[in-house]
């Protein structure tokens, strides 16, 4: 019996030793630039919310330092000050534009708003503004997040800025073509195990190597055949319902609400030569016909022709990736999958305008304060105010902070 236990201990020790060695070796492998990989490294799965930002994180993301607290909310721990006396607490709900994509924490609109308020009213009361922006969140996730986590913070006021991801068809986890509300909570034990394994760089490298193209395709859409015909993450009707429910819950808990509209860079989405759209559609249609017939090389020619007419065609990039996957060229396929995801942002514009219209309507009907950054963004369009086509830079965040500040003054909040 003792001999058996001894061998078990020896085997476990060997496995642990080899695991440590392999993990060290994995960290010596040169890292490739991978946007989706960078995003997922900041996130982890969540049973109810699909994902959350990792707690107590300290890393670089999009070339800027990112730190999170125990709730996974973005903070600057080195500059944190304990609030004393009467503190008016504001929580900024939203997605990556609220989180501060490609900007320093000090430049996020939540941080700038806190400074503006304390500079003006600091002698009377203290303002604490919490950045509760979570990368990739829709209004559906925001509603669940409010109920499960944010109410515990006991905010006096929340700002609500959703819509950007509601009109998308992609999720960073569990992207399977279904809408957000159709996903059931995932087994908590399974989620915990997956998160534990994903902490290992060696495990992630092995997973990426084994499922290289498949994981890229799954991360992008879940099912490539249905991606452009699948459901939006949140329909317009459900978006309206989610925002109204957020307002109802806030009112029930005596929390004031400001709805926020953050525009995207419309100028970057304008077609340079509109007349070429027809040629793009023809080439894309021919390519799809060839793809169905397994005439892969002919399909590639047509999809590249489509890109010549519209260089932002997410569909052309996507189906090029499918072609190269079928040709057993995973590196090229993954490149085109990545490009397809980037260009899919182009398709957000029309949908986001509809959802922003819903926000305006709700604010008008319910008498909810609206902080609309759109007009100020248009007035400042000659300046550089975007870090990416869908994310404001530090100057853009300054504008958003100012319109929220003005809304607070107008409504005496």
What are these regions (language model features)?
Residues 9-24:
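Hydrophobic membrane-insertion alpha-helices, especially the h-region
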Residues 24-36, 268-269:
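Helix-to-loop transition at the C-terminal end of transmembrane segments
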Residues 31-124, 380:
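Membrane/wall-proximal cationic-aromatic binding patches
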Residues 89-93, 130, 158-160:
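Conserved beta-strand elements of the Class I
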Residues 107, 123, 163-361, 365, ...:
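Serine-dependent acyl-ester chemistry module
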Residues 122-151:
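A conserved hydrophobic secondary-structure block that centers on an alpha-helix together
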Residues 139, 143, 236, 240, ...:
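Short, amphipathic alpha-helical "lid/cap" segments that border enzyme active or binding sites
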Residues 150-159, 164:
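Proline-aspartate-enriched helix->loop->beta-strand connector
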């Amino acid at each position: 019996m003792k001999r058996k236990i001894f061998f078990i201990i020896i085997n476990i020790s060997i496995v642990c030793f080899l695991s440590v060695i392999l993990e060290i070796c994995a960290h010596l492998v040169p890292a490739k630039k991978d946007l989706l990989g960078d995003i997922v490294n900041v996130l982890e799965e969540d049973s109810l919310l699909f994902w959350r930002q990792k707690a107590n994180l300290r890393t670089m993301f999009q070339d800027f330092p990112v730190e999170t607290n125990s709730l996974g909310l973005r903070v600057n721990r080195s500059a944190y000050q304990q609030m004393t006396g009467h503190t008016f607490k504001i929580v900024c709900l939203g997605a990556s534009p609220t989180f501060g994509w490609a900007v320093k924490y000090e430049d996020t609109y939540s941080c700038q708003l806190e400074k503006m308020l304390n500079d003006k009213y600091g002698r009377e009361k203290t303002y604490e503004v919490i950045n509760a922006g979570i990368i990739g969140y829709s209004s559906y996730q925001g509603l669940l997040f409010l109920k499960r986590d944010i109410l515990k913070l006991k905010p006096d006021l929340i700002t609500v800025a959703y819509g950007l991801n509601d009109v998308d068809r992609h999720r960073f986890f569990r992207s399977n073509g279904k809408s957000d509300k159709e996903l059931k909570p995932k087994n908590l034990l399974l989620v915990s195990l997956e998160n534990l394994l994903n902490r290992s760089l060696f495990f992630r490298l092995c997973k990426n190597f084994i499922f290289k193209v498949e994981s890229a395709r799954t991360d992008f859409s879940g099912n490539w055949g249905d991606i452009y015909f699948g459901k939006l993450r949140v329909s317009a009707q459900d978006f309206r319902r989610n925002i109204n429910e957020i307002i109802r819950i806030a009112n029930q808990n005596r929390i004031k609400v400001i709805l926020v509209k953050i525009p995207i860079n419309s100028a970057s989405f304008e077609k340079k030569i509109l007349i070429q759209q027809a040629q793009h559609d023809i080439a894309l249609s021919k390519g799809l016909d060839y793809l169905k017939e397994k005439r892969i090389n002919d399909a590639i020619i047509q999809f590249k022709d489509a890109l010549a007419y519209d260089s932002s065609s997410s569909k052309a990039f996507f189906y090029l990736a499918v072609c190269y996957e079928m040709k057993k060229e995973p590196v090229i396929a993954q490149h085109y999958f990545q490009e397809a995801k980037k260009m899919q942002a182009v398709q957000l514009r029309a949908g986001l305008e509809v959802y922003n219209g819903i926000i305006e309507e709700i604010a008008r009907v319910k008498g909810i304060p609206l902080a609309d950054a759109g007009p100020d963004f248009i007035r400042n369009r000659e300046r550089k105010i975007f870090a990416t086509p869908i994310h404001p830079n530090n100057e853009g965040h300054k504008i958003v902070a100012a319109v929220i500040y003005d809304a607070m003054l107008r409504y005496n909040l």
